[in-house]
Amino acid sequence: MVKAEHESRALAIFGTASDVGKSIVATALCRIFNNAGIDVAPYKAQNMSNNSGVTPDGCEIGRAQIVQAEAARVVPTADMNPVLLKPNSDTGAQVVLQGKVCSTETAKGYFRDTSLWAEAARESLERLMKRHEVVVIEGAGSCAEMNLYDRDFVNFRTARLSGASVILVADIDRGGVFGQVVGTLAVLPAEDRALVKGVIINRFRGDIDLFRDGVEMLESMTGIPVLGVIPYFRGFAIDAEDAVPLSAKVDPAGGPEEGKIGVAAIYFPHISNFTDLSPLEHDPAVELHYLHYPRSLKGYKALILPGSKNVRGDLAWLYSLGWEAEIRAFRAEGGIIMGICGGYQMLGNSIADPYGVEGSAGTTKALALLDVETVLEQDKCLANARGTVIGTSAEASGYEIHMGRSVVSDLCTPFIRVTARNNRPEDELDGAVSSDGRVMGSYFHALFDESSVKQWFLSLLEPSYRLQKHEKGRQESYELLADHFSSHLDLNKIFTIIDKVHS
């Protein structure tokens, strides 16, 4: 068991399956505990996601743990997500170990021997438990994948190592909640089942009173208390973990609603950092559509090519489906096109991968909408950055995560004047803008999180656009989330589980 220099507690949030809401439950508890005066930090031993972010000291971790750290009001560190797997094919992923790129592994190769990853995860957990009063541990997928159980260091092995009590989260919205909970508990070894101290039923729709007997039945069948039934709620804008959120409009039958600012984003097979678009998705003046399949883009004001973990592969996919013709037609009609990171690279002339960073070495012809040449290099750029959108007063801030180095010709103007990276002064240029200002690209993720950039961009699409007088900031969203969960959880029992007094 991990030994801390002071009395430390761990609470593990495990799931009956993937996407049952573990991340959002952990985020809510981080803010609830912090509001109660507890020094709390998040932890997830291994995350599989192309939605990552950069810590203040230049390390890459899952976006979910950055969000949880913000909710806990602590500085995010690599120890909060020591192993990050970034899928770049159907069977392989880049491994980021304690914040830095380590290797590229096939699924079979990764699971052949997990001792290196497990030891790094243990070291990080030990450091967190030495620094913080409570560590909220998020599990991965189902905590009861019995065919992988002996190699799973993310769920119950972490709980045993930290001495954590476990709360099991089930998603009633997908149906079969009794099977989820009872089935999960039934297959667990007795020593691990004994660690489960409570159950949370997530995403309930309708009148909770109608499920009171369901709660009693679950408690009778399992002998474990149900700590809360959480109603489905969309009133907060908090980044999703590793997939475009279920609320997103993907390949809708029609175009954008009349009166809305229509924005289309190409939904690449290896889309990354889709949370770059969250501020647009949550703006009531905007209708954002994620599109897999080519269609006429008439009715949309802008097309966004988001990030990609396999840029050349996704570019080949784009060509194979016939997207190029629709993109060029949209360009010819005066539509505004923006590329972010990998999407920016696709807007250039070519993408060269001489070292086979994303697969086979080679060069792929790009869309040639910006006069830019990109080479994928072996070293990854990881930075939090600030600057100004050139020619405007919009203050840009975001983060960079890319292997590419792009050279911009004089036919384009730079997009952003970078004034700082990782809190060090800089005077550099980022991105490119076409001569008519209708095509642009940048390496900055989270550009639209900055209200001045969002105002500038949407004003290009609709001159009458104005930001809402009161847009929910991230901290306000965490408070709304904490209030929502607090109203439906038995906090006295939860504080008792972590041996703390709830006041």
From Swiss-Prot:
What Pfam families does the record tag this protein with? CbiA, GATase_3
Gene Ontology process terms (BP): cobalamin biosynthetic process
The record ties this protein, via PROSITE patterns, to:
GATASE_COBBQ
Q: Which residues form the signal peptide?
A: none
**Where are the catalytic residues?**
C341, H445
Keyword set includes Amino-acid biosynthesis: no
Q: Which pathway does this chain act in?
A: Cofactor biosynthesis; adenosylcobalamin biosynthesis
List GO molecular-function terms, semicolon-separated. ABC-type vitamin B12 transporter activity; catalytic activity
Into which family does the record put it?
Belongs to the CobB/CobQ family. CobQ subfamily.
User: What protein name does the entry list?
Assistant: Cobyric acid synthase
Organism name? Pelodictyon phaeoclathratiforme (strain DSM 5477 / BU-1)
